[in-house]
């Protein structure tokens, strides 16, 4: 097991903050945001507004090139809007440094670096991103819980680069969960998982979202998985929000415009499904 668990403190980490109980507004909010890549002739977004509330899972849906991952990068402060403001728990992201942002937002991207760390140490990074910080019993408990929730206990001493793509994806999600931030961003969190693991992982994320009152926002291509696990939806096409809101926002018309093909919502038993239809 890792030697990090026996380290002594040489630097005092910032105390964790939790403003969810003090703020009745959205956890994440974009207000009239515009963004353009350098030297691009056309902006990706103009006047985009968006909200994510505590205890809800929001799916960002759309074809490739719709602007979904760009929106996540803006919400995570990876990129900066050219106009408008983005807030987390009522505070402007633009006023925060990287450390402060990481106290509020955990982000699992599609392109994760794979340091030569054990699974345990990788998840521990969610608690202690600096090796000079001490590790408390609470930290160990949080890490152990995240490992158990993602069924990673058999792999704790394995190196991440020895794992399959799906197993690594679960490690990164566990690390983000261990951060215990009020916002969790996931870019295609199930892309490397088989159908069984997709549902199991999304159920874990769903349970954690509701139990800890986090705001979870994820980009996902599978509309039917989104309909099954998410509360709110943002449907995007070419940088424009076609529709957003609860399940009532996912209409036949909105889906058809978002995916540029005829689609309809069907109810089979208690399950809602998005089905392509003949034109």
Question: What is each PLM-predicted segment?
Answer:
Residues 17-30, 34-47, 97:
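A short, flexible loop at the N-terminus of ABC-type nucleotide-binding domains that lies
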Residues 61-63:
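The feature captures the beta-strand-to-loop junction immediately N-terminal to the Walker
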Residues 76:
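Helix-to-loop junction immediately C-terminal to a conserved catalytic motif
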Residues 84-92, 101:
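Conserved ABC transporter NBD signature motif
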Residues 137-155, 180:
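Conserved ABC ATPase "signature" region
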Residues 159-163, 167:
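Conserved ABC ATPase signature
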Residues 184-188:
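Catalytic Walker B motif of ABC-type/P-loop ATPase nucleotide-binding domains
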